[in-house]
């Protein structure tokens, strides 16, 4: 019982659960129960962002199993922050990832509900309008595109997008705090004049490791730790393992006892839903858990979102055998060549095809080549496929 998912209780400024209760209860009857049985009673945004932003010291965070401290001079925050805020502005996230984040009621954007619809392409670029939305210390500006409204808490805890709000509250100078960051060609996050090729090419970046106080010019940066291994991965690893089991498996323990592990839909539901409920989203039922293929795809989705910008997807795509499809798909994002008076053009999904964004993956890339010096020492060794 040493490790568990980190969560923080609901506060006065926490966002309420989705209001389409009847619709969600058909998906997850326990959703409106208190956490961990359901998703009620916790602050989903803070429960996610406090783990990475430095708000909660790693020594008292029960989710961190292994971690390492990140240097403030060379960290995801520096890579993501705009040049004008002391960063490099070159950490790009792709449109595929953005579109994978669900709506606040757990529906995919292409299957959104009537209560929380994903806007049509003819209007998705328009401003949300009205007053700025504030919840859990996060500010969603009224100038934000409608396509980013009513998305799941992990979206706001992870993704920096055009018209994102960067508080930088520790700054001693107003010019570096409370900044509306835009990625238009004439926007706030435009390129460093000394390095014109070093700019954000997709209009999306990672804010997972950003604290509200962080400001690198005239302020301070919170100490942060990178999650080498955290309890959320233990849970999803276990769910994936028992989903793939075809027959019971018995382990001999050091004390002479035996432990038998088998395909268990109740465990799949219990531990998968811990992750979903912490994120403020509906879980699954045992009826869904009984479908191995369905659960496999759900796990792939959940790992992509839960561990975004944590270095897990590199290995996941390879062990699943999905890397060729994923990496040979063109990179796309916003049209960052558009100016601020060309809003619709900016938000039109654009394929990137220059020397810095082209990528390819062939079968041989699943393996490393065996060095020639090693092959020369042992004539019985055979080089890995396609490495000649």
At which residue positions do the language-model features occur?
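Segments forming glycine/polar-rich beta-alpha architectures that bind adenosine-containing cofactors
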Residues: 66-154, 160, 165
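Long, intrinsically disordered, low-complexity segments
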Residues: 3-102, 183-206, 211, 218-231, ...
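Internal, charge-rich low-complexity segments
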Residues: 2-17, 105-113, 170-177, 246-253
